[in-house]
């Protein structure tokens, strides 16, 4: 979810409605506590009564980015979710009355994970960037109040996917692992929704090395008992140059499906 066009992350904006929460988050992330938005173009976190949001300052800045089960396109997608409408669900092998254990190893804002949970899957979300993990944690906290049944099927882990998958015991291995890595080099910015561009512009975090996509795909296949599903732009090369066992095309993206090896 991170690219080279970074913008500075200035800190956490204190809010009269949530001053203690803003201060606690700033302390945990080791970021400055702001009393007003940055004057120059930059990113900042804002903790208000509406939840935690990643915001941008400057002209033509997109609106706040937060994790929500009710707002905008995501809310509409969840309300309309069905096995027939969601190509991702079919790629994962979801069927009516069947509850799968799925790991979303590149969770991002958790939008696909929420849809899978709405369709009955139990989903573990793995996110390694502390800022994105904080957005997810806040969204799931609010979801436990507004959508308790759905939220109960979502479990967030702030960790590096390679390390987390490597430590799974045989009994803990999921049926399905989903990967949605950053769009490959050469993809146009137009391929990325405007409300997600700020997320892609987050600066690198200390201690986080670039994702080794070859190792991640190999370990995901070794850890999944049924399949690995990789979300790709429609015309992009397969992840790590590894041809999938089969594909399911969508409008602008496709799902490359690899047979899991842990069930052999």
Curated annotation (Swiss-Prot):
The entry's keywords: Cytoplasm, Methyltransferase, rRNA processing, S-adenosyl-L-methionine, Transferase
Gene Ontology MF term list: rRNA (guanine-N2-)-methyltransferase activity
Subcellular location: Cytoplasm
Residues at which S-adenosyl-L-methionine binds: 111-112, 127-128, 180
Chief location: cytoplasm
Stored Pfam families: SAM_MT
Enzyme Commission number(s) of this protein: 2.1.1.242
Keyword Metal-binding recorded: no
Catalytic activity: guanosine(1516) in 16S rRNA + S-adenosyl-L-methionine = N(2)-methylguanosine(1516) in 16S rRNA + S-adenosyl-L-homocysteine + H(+)
Stored InterPro entries: 16SrRNA_methylTrfase_J, SAM-dependent_MTases_sf
Function statement: Specifically methylates the guanosine in position 1516 of 16S rRNA.
Entry similarity comment: Belongs to the methyltransferase superfamily. RsmJ family.
Protein's name according to its UniProt entry: Ribosomal RNA small subunit methyltransferase J
Organism: Alkalilimnicola ehrlichii (strain ATCC BAA-1101 / DSM 17681 / MLHE-1)
């Amino acid at each position: 979810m991170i690219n080279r066009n970074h913008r500075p992350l200035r800190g956490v904006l204190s809010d009269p409605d949530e001053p203690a929460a803003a201060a606690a988050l700033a302390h945990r992330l080791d970021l400055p506590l702001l009393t007003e938005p940055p004057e120059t173009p930059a990113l900042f976190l804002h903790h208000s009564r509406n939840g935690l949001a990643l915001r941008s300052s400057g002209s033509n800045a997109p609106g706040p980015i937060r994790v929500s089960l009710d707002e905008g396109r995501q809310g509409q997608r969840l309300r309309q979710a069905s096995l027939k409408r969601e190509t991702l669900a079919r790629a994962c092998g979801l069927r009516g009355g069947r509850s799968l254990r799925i790991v979303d190893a590149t969770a991002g804002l958790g939008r696909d994970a929420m849809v899978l949970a709405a369709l009955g899957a139990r989903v573990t979300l793995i996110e390694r960037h502390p800022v994105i993990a904080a957005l997810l944690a806040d969204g799931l906290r609010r979801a436990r109040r507004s959508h308790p049944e759905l939220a109960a099927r979502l479990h967030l882990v702030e960790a590096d996917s390679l390390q987390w998958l490597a430590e799974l015991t045989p009994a803990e291995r999921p049926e399905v692992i989903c990967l949605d890595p950053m769009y490959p080099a050469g993809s146009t910015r137009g391929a990325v929704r405007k409300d997600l561009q700020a997320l892609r512009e987050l600066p690198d975090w200390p201690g986080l090395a670039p994702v080794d996509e070859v190792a991640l795909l190999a370990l995901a296949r070794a850890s999944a008992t049924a399949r690995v599903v990789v979300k790709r732009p429609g015309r992009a090369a397969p992840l790590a140059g590894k041809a999938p066992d089969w594909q399911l095309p969508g409008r602008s993206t496709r799902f490359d499906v690899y047979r899991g090896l842990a069930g052999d």
